[in-house]
Amino acid sequence: MTVTGIIAEFNPFHNGHKYLLEQASGLKIIAMSGNFVQRGEPAIVDKWTRAQMALEAGADLVLELPFLVSVQAADFFAKGAVDILERLGIDYLMFGTEEVLDYESISKVYGEKAEQMEAYLAGLPDSLSYPQKTQAMWQEFAGLNFSGSTPNHILGLAYAKAVAGRDIKLCSIQRQGAGYHSLSANQEFASATALRQNLDQPDFLKKFTPAHHLLETAPKVIWSDLFSYLRYQIVTCPDLTNFYQVNQELAVRIRVALKSSETIEELVEQVATKRYTKARVRRLLTYILVGARQEELPSGVHILGFSEQGRQHLSQLKGKVELVSRIGKDPWDSLTQQADKVYQLGNPALREQNFGRVPIMKGK
């Protein structure tokens, strides 16, 4: 049977995600961000609720990306997720994108010229942000010209890099309906951004989310719920450079900006520069919030849920892949579990996120 992998956040799960799943063939494996997502913010609802949404819409297996894969720039996010999906035996990696391109050919370009391309990237001036450097690299070697306002396309290129040299085929699907950041909605599709801004509108959620009942009833977490904890971390930590990827320049900028910032948006706005994008700053603040330091990624794969087909696939992997279905005395990934504890501070109605939790079985 064909095995299709999808890398996702489902923040929250909407009709566009359902459409993507419907286009996938064979067994459908989702590598999903945990309780913090790639752009450096808490997921609007917890990982278990989002896994349930995916299973109800046709996913066969949902696994959790570790924190230090979930909260990363596109290239590192893609590589970490593909590393995990490859171990689970995927044949295809499917993703939505704003651009209709031959990503397979782009992947081959990187496979043939990876060393030159990375050397070119490293030689670009530090005054450029990482996304700007990446855009310059693709323009130079593949003739691609794109803006930073198409995040799914940027991720598509990151996936092309990540699968280069692997026995995984890329399958891109044209993004349906509203753009990634769009606040508008058409007859069938609304962006995750629009949904996050309309959480108090049941009719809107019912129209654009297949599992609206789960989204409406699940405890929500947003940055403002955690901002006071971030302030505490910054004020009480003697050296912010101890946290993952925080350099001295950023540590100073963050401390100065905090004095006149009352919200996370104000803090990000004041810290960000041309070189340090807002997305990067949000990720750094998330690292500080959860106390992230450089750590090895876990060897095991944490399973959040499965269908009967997914269960059968897992049984074939036993002995070949370290599968984690219950987190007990021995941690799966201590940093992810630490991040989950911080996430729970955002809403007292949240259930325990790790201990005693077992994978969701679809239909039971």
From Swiss-Prot:
GO biological process: tRNA modification
EC number: 6.3.4.-
A Pfam family of this chain: HIGH_NTase1
Keyword Ligase: yes
Xref: SUPFAM superfamilies: Nucleotidylyl transferase
Swiss-Prot/TrEMBL keywords: ATP-binding, Cytoplasm, Ligase, Nucleotide-binding, RNA-binding, tRNA processing, tRNA-binding
A molecular function GO annotation: ATP binding
Stated family: Belongs to the TmcAL family.
Its job: Catalyzes the formation of N(4)-acetylcytidine (ac(4)C) at the wobble position of elongator tRNA(Met), using acetate and ATP as substrates. First activates an acetate ion to form acetyladenylate (Ac-AMP) and then transfers the acetyl group to tRNA to form ac(4)C34.
Descriptive protein name: tRNA(Met) cytidine acetate ligase
Species, as recorded: Streptococcus sanguinis (strain SK36)
